[in-house]
Amino acid sequence: MIVVTGIGIVSALGIGVQENYASLKSQKSGLDNIKNFQTTHNVPAGEVKYTNSQLKALLNLRESKTYSRTTLLGMLAAREAVQSANIGTGRVGLISATSVGGMDLTEVFYPSFEQGVTLDKVVHHDSADSTIHIAKDLKIEDFSTTISTA
């Protein structure tokens, strides 16, 4: 049996269910030019308006620790979902889905690959990495799995 008991959301419209709902009601668009990634393209996209450093601050995470953007966004949404569900400390599992995993860190790392740089950023590439960090953040020690949506 699957029971959905809470909701959390992070999107180009905002962070949290209330901010997203208010944005939808006021017909606000989340589309804008890309600002948080280096790109040669100047096209509108639905981008979460916070930098990774700002997301870490919202989550009270150490700035020096490396997390993929997928992990940071997932942590915010998952924390809200768990809080709205009022889940206790009983048997809790986590099913997380992602299409990009830690690709943002891999793309930054790749140009320096042939220069002998350490592989510490690449360990975050795997899709399951975000699920592992989210489960740890929520203190979920039971079942967890990752669905690749790519």
How would you describe each model-predicted region?
Residues 1-144:
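Conserved "HGTGT" condensation-loop signature of ketosynthase/thiolase-family condensing enzymes
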Residues 146-150:
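Short beta->alpha junction loops
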